[in-house]
Amino acid sequence: IITAYDIEKLLDEPNVLGLGEMMNYPAVIGGDEAVLKKISAAREKKKICDGHAPCVRGRELQAYCAAGIRTDHECASYEEAFEKLQQGMYILIREGSSAQDLEPIVRGILEHKTDTSRFAFCTDDKKMSDILANGHINNNVRKAVSLGLPAEDALCMASFHAAQCYGLTGRGAIAPRYHADIVVFDNVTDFSINSVYKAGIAVAPASDIALQNSETAETVTPASFSIKRITDSIHVVPVPRSAFAAEQFMPSGSDNFHVIGMQRGTLFTQHLVFPRQECTAQLKEGKLCYLAVLERHKNTGNIGRALLHGYGVSNGAIASSIGHDSHNIIVAGSNAADMHRAVEEVIDMKG
């Protein structure tokens, strides 16, 4: 556990801009002393405190901001973003792989003619394959402009506003006394990148392909880093196939079942309730699947189970030990045998 003392030491590092997203917002709002000490450590050194406050509104939002939190990237609607803007926050508009919040917020900005000087862009969990296919912040700019946002506003949100937010003086603009870190686009519609300059020197002409860099993790990982710490992190009790049997998810004696409904482009899910007969039919059709979360840190043997709608697994199973923000083993599948096999595979490969 990182303490306030640890954070004080880290904040002295010149490349540390501030305190990363304060996810434990209930503790901030409730005045938890240990949490507030971490925020105070950043504020005393005049470093920014990033927020993480999905759906926090009203008086709770005021308390959260009063503690010293200055940004939020969890807004999924314009209304939430505008309320946080009114409380003095910078809004980082997120367009990631799962959470795609840019369109509703930009449409709200345009409809209400909202000043954009305290808006910036972020991605927050974007897969490398998506970055390769669609780009990173330049994709945010492209999409915002396609929705009608003026190109100059979108470019400022991608550069100058973000620099202002994080106190990066001398960055984010092309002007005297500013670092000559420049991206040159072919146009301001699809924003295809022509070249990149760092400190005034061309470092990436259009002909360069980033994937040609042959440097691997082995060559850049510090020798002092313990590989064992990350390859020996799966601690689970043996899991029998029966743990994924249908009756574990749909016990006898129950006529209706709660179902998690996935929605594309957002982290928000729907709370659905289906009768047993409907669940059975949708499981056969592949519209529903089984979902389980296995505790993998302390050998507790705890397993959470649910029915999941909209994931698309109709035959087989998918398991992963990456699952923000607790990173237990998650498995979704159509049958016990495949779910058990997928979990065993994750355990065998040590995550």
For each predicted feature, which ranges?
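A short glycine-threonine-serine/GTX helix/turn-capping micro-motif
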Residues: 126-131
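Fold-independent oxyanion-binding glycine-rich loops
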Residues: 21-23, 52-54, 75, 87, ...
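Histidine/acidic residue-rich metal-binding segments in metalloenzymes
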Residues: 2-20, 27-93, 100-121, 132-146, ...
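Contiguous hydrophobic segments
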Residues: 82, 87-125, 245-266, 323-324, ...
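Active-site microenvironment of metallo-dependent hydrolases
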Residues: 132-148, 152-351
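A broad detector of the eukaryotic-type serine/threonine protein kinase catalytic domain
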Residues: 24, 69, 89, 163-167, ...
